Amino acid sequence: LLLGWAWIDPKAAVSGGPVITGLFANFLIVVIFFLQGWRLRPARMFEVWADGYTLWITQIAIIATPVALVLSGWAVGVISEEKLSPFLLLACLPTTISSCVVYARGAGGDGDYALGHATLSNLLAPFLVPLAWFFLIRPSGPAHFPMTSALMEVVPNMLLLVGLPCFFGWWFRKAVTPKPKPLAEWLAGNLPLVGIALLAYFSLGQALILHGREQCRAEAVELLLPLGGGFLLLSFFSWFLSGLIRRDRGGRVATFFCLSQKSLALGIPMVHLLVGSNDAELFKWVFPVILLHVIQLVGGALIMLLLRR
C-alpha cells in the first residue's frame, strides 16, 4: 500500500525535506534493529556450533554462492556493469530470519536449526556487509567518498544504528520481558515490516521525484529477468549444496532455505547506511532488494509446497 501511495503521490514521501526524512529514516533503522535484537535467541544460535564443519560451510555458502552467481552473470553479459555493484551488495546480505524459518517448518524441515543459522548470519552481517562494501563492491563515482573517510563514517553508524540497538533489544528482552505476552511477540515480528515499508516508501518516492515514473518502470523491467533467473539458479545450487552439508531431510530443508533467502529486514537499512539516505542513486541500490524480496517470498512459498509433498 505504501509503495502504491508513493507511486501515486511521490511528493508526499519527501514533503518533510531531506533533513527530516534522513532523521526519521535513522530512527526507523534504530527501531528495526532494536526489535531484531529483541527477537534474537543466542542460546539457540550456539547449538549450531555442535558441528563446526556444517556451521562454517553454511555461513560461507550464504554469501559465496550468490556472489559467484552474480559474478558469473556479469562475466557472460546477463548483468551489466552498472548493475554489478547493486547485485553484489544484494548477494552479500544475510539470510532472512523470518521467512527461512517459516518455510523450513512448513516444508517439514528443522525450523530451530534454520533459526540458529539465520541468527548467526544476521549477527555477522553488520561486520561482513561493510567489509564486502569496501573490499568487493567499492562503487566509484562522485556520489561516493574515499575508503578511509567511508570507514570513519560508516563504522560508527553501524555501531550506533545497528550494533547498540541490537544489544539493547536483546538485553531488554532478557532483563525486562523474559516472558513476553503474545501481543508483544506479534508487535516485535510485524513492526519491523512497517519500518521497512516506510524506508522503501521514502526511497521510491525520492526516486520517482528524481527520475520519473517511466525510468522507474524501465528499471523494474530490466531487473526482473536477472533477479528472477538468479533466484531460480540460487535455489538450484542451494538444494544441491544443502544435500552435501546435511544428509538428513530436516537439516537439508532448513539449510536450503538459509542459503536461498535474503533479508529485506537488514538489506534496506544497510543500504541506507552505506549509500546515504539522501543519495540521488539510492533507488538503484534499494529497488533490487525490494524486487528480490517479492520474488523470493512467492518462489519460496511455492518451493515449500513442493517440498512438503
What kind of feature is each model-predicted range?
Residues L1-R309:
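Alpha-helical transmembrane segments of multi-pass small-molecule/ion transporters
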